[in-house]
Amino acid sequence: MAKEKFERNKPHVNVGTIGHVDHGKTTLTAAISSVLTKTYGGEVKDFAQIDNAPEERERGITINTSHIEYDTPSRHYAHVDCPGHADYVKNMITGAAQMDGAILVVASTDGPMPQTREHILLSRQVGVPFIIVFMNKCDMVDDEELLELVEMEVRELLSEYDFPGDDLPVIQGSALKALEGEPEWEAKILELAEALDTYIPEPERAIDGAFILPIEDVFSISGRGTVVTGRVERGIIKVGEEVEIVGIKDTTKTTCTGVEMFRKLLDEGRAGENCGVLLRGTKREDVERGQVLAAPGSITPHTTFKSEIYVLSKEEGGRHTPFFKGYRPQFYFRTTDVTGTIELPEGVEMVMPGDNVAMTVTLICPIAMDEGLRFAIREGGRTVGAGVVAEIVA
């Protein structure tokens, strides 16, 4: 069977379901797939297919995730759903599935539960920009006031973590009843789809962002100067443009005098492309792997930041023992390792393999970073954890 061509005529948006265990995330995922396919066409995935989440590896970490796709008239959505709480933690911290917005599922029979709070906190830490609430199992609650109470509670909880709790959409529905084809509950799924379309803005494409290229290699070409190579992470670099070399040492400015790809000279290098950039007047020894080439003023170097970390379990090939304050591993950013020290939150004495924890990291030399940057934690080249920059301190 021939592969379907990927249609690029609609904006592509990444979403996912989050929330407490057994509140109905996977059932909702199946219901969205079922109702939208029935309404707008496409291929339906049932509960069993979604629940049987395949294993993926991201930065050496095993994560179970289900990916489904669905369409509304105006957009194409890629949706992730994870079977277990640990999978969510890993998924969100590694950025294995970056979300432009999340659907928080709360069972109206229970109200917010511990993992509801934890997923909201994680969303805040890893930079999920928008949350829409789906109150599930509303068919099992007869008391209108109880539903109002749960909605208030969820809104307050979201506000506590700096999400606009008073303004974000809350849809009251029943994923199971919608899946069983009951029209009044199917309508709620369409209402949720409408909220996705209107509340989550169209994400900026990588190519529209400010130019940045993590440097992987540096060469000297006699008579022409210094060439740095790497994959353009976002934006476009054009010949003749000024760029900054950021990280590890003091920031310097230079000009791009050439772009080449597969030994051909080009006018520009774009997001996603591997290319070599020729730099005017830059010496071979002034540039090194681990620095980035960036649009002037678009990114700055920092040494201290707050982060959210997931520590690999022994089974995942991580540490066999906990670590304590004063732990000094390497932090792998983009293309290089930098040693750093950690500061644990008050009251946390040690961190066990398999835990996730918020910690402050101080690196021995600055790295170009902004909030949301992912990194790995390594000991002698072996990955022992994954993290994300939650807030820059210095």
UniProtKB/Swiss-Prot annotation:
A Pfam family reported for this protein in Swiss-Prot or TrEMBL: GTP_EFTU_D3
Places the protein is found: Cytoplasm
Region G3: start-end pairs: 81-84
Gene3D superfamilies according to UniProt: P-loop containing nucleotide triphosphate hydrolases (3.40.50.300), Translation factors (2.40.30.10)
Region G2, annotated ranges: 60-64
Region (G5): 174-176
Entry annotated with the keyword Protein biosynthesis: yes
This protein's record includes keyword Oxidoreductase: no
Protein EC: 3.6.5.3
Domain of life, source organism: Bacteria
Reactions listed under catalytic activity: GTP + H2O = GDP + phosphate + H(+)
Signal sequence range: none
Region (G1): 19-26
NCBIfam families to which the protein is assigned, alphabetical: EF-Tu, PRK00049.1, PRK12735.1, PRK12736.1, small_GTP
Role noted for this protein: GTP hydrolase that promotes the GTP-dependent binding of aminoacyl-tRNA to the A-site of ribosomes during protein biosynthesis.
Quaternary assembly: Monomer.
Similarity section: Belongs to the TRAFAC class translation factor GTPase superfamily. Classic translation factor GTPase family. EF-Tu/EF-1A subfamily.
Name by which UniProt lists this protein: Elongation factor Tu
Organism: Shewanella sediminis (strain HAW-EB3)
